[in-house]
Design a protein with these regions (language model features):
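Short, flexible loop segments at boundaries between secondary-structure elements
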Residues: 150-161
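Glycine-rich, Arg-bearing micro-motifs that act as flexible, cationic patches
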Residues: 108-109, 125-150
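Solvent-exposed polar/charged
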Residues: 25, 119-120, 150-151
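Short, hinge-like loop/turn segments at secondary-structure boundaries
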Residues: 50-52, 116-119, 144-145
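Histidine-centered beta-alpha loop that forms part of the nucleotide-sugar donor binding/catalytic region
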Residues: 8, 131-133, 161
Length: 161
């Protein structure tokens, strides 16, 4: 069984990791991917102004890619503590860390990021915590968890309170 466990810095996320670790620690053939979505990339790194000169355009494109890669590296370094803490929690619960993979996403749409990672990693199960949602969000279906429940066809979804 391949499980994608979406984590963030919240206390609720910490409880979800504890729950999964204690529930699955003795389950044979289980692989867990800890997945954390970085904050959105700044707008100025999404595209450059362009140029009518093909050589200048190519140079601008290379420069933009380099700046994007540098931003992603910096964000991963500053956010790696989220995955490190989740690993520590799994270890404390007795989970075999040789079956754990760590990965990041970095798009604006967190739910879409989670689904893309679940599909590309061939996960069968997605585990998320339910964050407190306002009455308005509940009525109109807002929030990452609600979006996953609506859009995640072909996956088992565990929502841990």
């Amino acid at each position: 069984m391949r499980v994608l466990l979406a984590v963030d810095e919240s206390e609720n996320s910490h409880r979800v990791v504890q729950y999964v670790g204690s529930l699955l620690r003795r389950t044979p053939d289980v692989a867990v991917t800890l997945f954390h979505v970085l904050k959105p990339m700044p707008r100025e790194l999404l595209e450059h102004g362009g140029s009518e000169n093909p050589a200048a355009e190519a140079e601008l494109s290379v420069q933009l890619r380099n700046e994007q890669e540098a931003w992603i590296r910096k964000e991963r370094e500053s956010e790696c503590h989220v995955l490190r803490e989740a690993c520590e929690t799994l270890t404390q619960s007795g989970f075999d860390m040789s079956h754990v993979t760590l990965t990041f996403g970095h798009e604006d749409d967190i739910a879409r990021n989670i689904l893309e990672e679940a599909r590309s990693g061939h996960h069968e199960t997605i585990v998320v915590g339910r964050h407190g949602t306002s009455r308005i969000k509940r009525i109109f279906g807002g929030g990452v968890t609600d979006q996953l429940l609506r859009d995640a066809k072909g996956f088992a979804i565990w929502v841990v309170e």
